[in-house]
Each structure stands twice: as structure tokens, then as C-alpha cells.
Amino acid sequence: MAGLESKVSDMKIKSDVVFYIDEASGNDETGNGSQTSPFKTAIHALETDANCTIFVKKNGSEEFEPITTNALKKAKKGVEQAAKKKAKAAEAEAAAAARAAAAKEAEAKRLEAAKNIVLKEPKDAPAAKKIAIIDSTNFRDSRVRVNGWVHRMRTQKGIIFIILRDGTGFLQCVLSGKVYDRASYDFINLGPESTVCLYGVIKELPEGKSAPGNHELVVDYYQILHAAPTGEEAFTNRLNAEAEPSYLLDQRHLVIRGETASSVLKVRARALRAMRDTFENLKMTEVTPPCMVQTQVEGGATLFKFNYYGQDAYLTQSSQLYLEAALPALGSVYTIQESFRAEKSLTRRHLSEFTHVEFELPFVNFGEFLEIIEEFICQTIDRLLDDPIATPLIKQLNPDFVKPSRPFMRLSYEDAIKYLNEHNILTPEGEQHKFGDDIAEAAERKMTDQINRPIFLTYFPLEIKSFYMKRVVDRPELTESVDCLMPNVGEIVGGSMRISDIQELLAAYKREGIDPAPYYWFTEQRKYGTTEHGGCGLGLERFLAWLCDRYTVRECCLFPRFTERCTP
């Protein structure tokens, strides 16, 4: 240290300021130029004080030495270059600020002029016909008016492009010229999801350009019906791809406006229509059974119980019993309505309220029953793939969808147990499957995905199935029951032949500990003209999850209901 002090005193110091530079460990940002907190560069030292005295510790050196003449010249040159660069940057920044100010002033003047433009519907134009976007192709080169929500909007070189949505489709709308001039003021505070009425002529797009429907509306007049908020409250700030699933469920009323969610709901609507058309073709009659009941179908553990004028009642688990009652009156019957299950499991395949597509068939045996289920599924899919509305949506949602090949694979429960064990697909407890196991969802799906084709899983043990299922004549420990399994989703249909003998049904009540009194009307179906009959139920949301390649059935209904979720 004494040697360093001697060097300092021996130098011809121009300033009282002395800075220390450590090329290895110094820091221009956090250092203060002292020996204990040195700078990194001589340039920074000179920028701090141009007349300072500088000592430098080179890489690998243990001592601070006076800066060499060449190093000092180089540092001073670096300071000069940095100063020029900084001055040039400041000049450029000032010029940019001046241009921005001029542009802002010009834009303010333009907007003020736009504000004073009075836009009127063209007097010499034909009357605009109100249409839905889905009908746009039929009105090309015609003047129309279209109401809708602003799905997206952008401005480019004096043109405003709007993608308008009305629930039936999307339409590109173009505002230019005088219409743009006025709209450029009116639309400043027009956020996504604003509602507007746009007037103009629908023009087919030239080759090389694209838009929904391959046409666009050239707007000549508009009306703003309601301006949705911008800024922090803008619709686009309410939803984002990284949002938690629970938040998206809270915002489901907004989520369904998105292209994917609305596409699923449109396919759902077309699927319901296709199913009804298929039922009509199969000569089945639609009925509407009650949703408030005093009987159970699938066991008491999943019943929603409520007080019905002082009596215990339940939300229906299934309309099966009522469909059976309708057989002698109407023949083959079906219903499409909600069923309710107090499911405790939070899986992606379960809902507490779901749309249940059920049908019952008289005078059939088990083989015929399976054939009709297969026919119903395949005919419904064929109708959807021929539907001009559903087909493009299905291709958009599930590009790799292939309609199921027929016949569906028949796989008995006992053979399924063998398959699971042979392929080392274990129970949730990590054990091999055995007869009597209720095959878990994960194992069932893994097997189905490996086989990769529709499966009729048949002949389940009596002990794991419902009381009303018919036993196999020569194997009374088995039932004439079936689950239809689809790759990537698992079970979508469950059904069985029903007990047709009154004594067998009474024995089933006793075996399951069920009081037969509330079921008197169901029992009497076996008293007055019984017959072999079967029926099944299809979960619409599971069917859609398979068809539209959705991860969870919660995406396949308007507002899903499941454990702890009953809003919005």
C-alpha cells in the first residue's frame, strides 16, 4: 500500500480525483472507483471526471499501476466516440419526437375533421335487405345489412377491416373512403364484442385473397348499436390462453364466444338434429319423461335428493324406467334430456348434469340390440359428415377424425380381463385384474386406445351391474349388458337387455335391498304383456368429446355442472 501511495504522490496529478480500474473484477455500474470498489473501464472513469488520475490493475496482476500513455489516449478517444454517439442519438430522438408530435397534431386535425363528417345512408342505393351471415353467398352483389358482434378489427393504410360474427358465421367487412374517414373517429373507443349494424354490398374476393366464405362486405353505411369497453376492461384482457381452468369456467359466458367453443356448441346442435333424424329413420318415437322422480336406476349413492311437498324425491339418473313403460303404447321410444348424477369424482369424463340420449326397443334379442346401437351411432355420424354446417367444423376441431368402421369389435368382459392381464394393464392398486373387478376408467381407456377401434364390451358380471339387467341364460352370474367404447374417450354408451320376467324382477329388488312399492308401475309392465326388450343410454357430451377431439366433456356443453361447480 505504501508503494502505491508513493506512486500517486510522484505522479503529476491534474485533479484531486483518483480512480482505480480492475479489468478482471471491476464494475462500471456498481463500482465507485475506489480500490475496494473499482471501475471496469478507463472510459467510464474519464466520463465521470475528465481530469482524473487513473490506476489500472491488469488481468492476472496483483497491483494497481498508473495507466499507460497509450491506454489513456485510447480511453479518451473512446470517450469522444461515445459522446458523439450519444449526441447523435439525442438528435435522432429529438427528430423522432418532433415527427411524432407533428403526426399527433395531424391526426388530431384529421380526427376533428372526421368528427364533422355526416355519414348518411346512400340515397341512390337499393334498400338493404337484412340477412344472416350464413346466407351471405346467396346475396353476393346485393346490398344488405348485417347485425353482429365485432369479433376482430384492424386498420391498415386507410382501410378498416372488421370480422363480424352473428352466431351463424363470420363475415369480413371493409370500410374505406368516406366511410373509413368517419369510422376512424367513431371506432376509436369501439372494443372487441361491440355490436354494430353494417350496410353494403357483398363482393366475391378475387383469386389469391381469402376471407370467411371467400367474400367480403364493402360497407357504405354503419350504425353502432353498443360500444364494448376498451383498455383494461377490453374483452381481450378478460381471457387468455394461460388462464387457469377454474377462471375460464367462471368466465364461461365469455369463453363460448370464441371460435373453438362456439364451434363445439354448433356441432352439438347438429348432432342432436342428426340423432333425431336417425331415430325417425329407425321408426322410434320421442317421449319426454319426468325429471323429478321417486325411484332410482343407477344406485342411491349418486342421487340428488330434494323435498317434494314434504316427500323425498330425486332428480332423475336415467329415464329408462319410463321409456320401458312407454313401449306397449308407442313401440320403440327414445328421449333426449338431462340426467343428474351426484358424481364425487373430478374426472374429465364426468358431469353432474349431462344430456342423456336414451332409447328402448321391444321384441329384440341381445344380438339385434347391439346391431341397432351400432346402426344408430354410424348412421348419426354419416349424417353429420354429410351436413354442410357440421362437416367443416368437425374437420376444424378434429382433422384426423375417421368414422368408425363396421362391424364394431365384440369383446366379452372375461376376454377383456385376459387382455388387460396379458398386456400388463393393472388395476389402480397395481394388481392384475380378476373376474368381478369393475374395470377402472384408465385401464379401460388404455385397452381401447391400444385396440384402436370401437368396441362392444359385453356380458358383465351381475354383481357390478344394475338390478334391472337380464342374466345370461346358461351363465346366470353374467348379464346381457354392453358398454360401447371409443378410442381416446372410452365409454360413450351403456345398455343391456332388461329383465322381462316379473318373478325375476321381484327377486332382483330383494337381492339389492330395494323396496318394490315405489316401483309398482314398473313391475306391472311384466304383468300385462311382457316381452324381451333392451335399451341403452348415450352421454351426448362424451360422444362430442370423441367426435370433436375435446380433452374434457366440460367443453362439450354450454355451462358444465360437476362437483362443486354450479355457476355461472
Swiss-Prot record:
Catalytic activity: tRNA(Asn) + L-asparagine + ATP = L-asparaginyl-tRNA(Asn) + AMP + diphosphate + H(+)
InterPro entries for this protein: Aa-tRNA-synt_II, aa-tRNA-synth_II, aa-tRNA-synth_II/BPL/LPL, Asn-tRNA-ligase, AsnRS_N, Asp/Asn-tRNA-synth_IIb, NA-bd_OB-fold, NA-bd_OB_tRNA
Record localization: Cytoplasm
GO terms (BP aspect): asparaginyl-tRNA aminoacylation; cytoplasmic translation
Main localization category: cytoplasm
Key words of the record: Aminoacyl-tRNA synthetase, ATP-binding, Cytoplasm, Ligase, Nucleotide-binding, Protein biosynthesis
GO terms, molecular function: asparagine-tRNA ligase activity; ATP binding; nucleic acid binding
The enzyme's E.C. designation: 6.1.1.22
One Gene Ontology CC term in the entry: cytoplasm
Gene3D superfamilies: asparaginyl-tRNA synthetase, N-terminal domain (3.30.1910.20), Bira Bifunctional Protein, Domain 2 (3.30.930.10), Nucleic acid-binding proteins (2.40.50.140)
Listed name of the protein: Probable asparagine--tRNA ligase, cytoplasmic
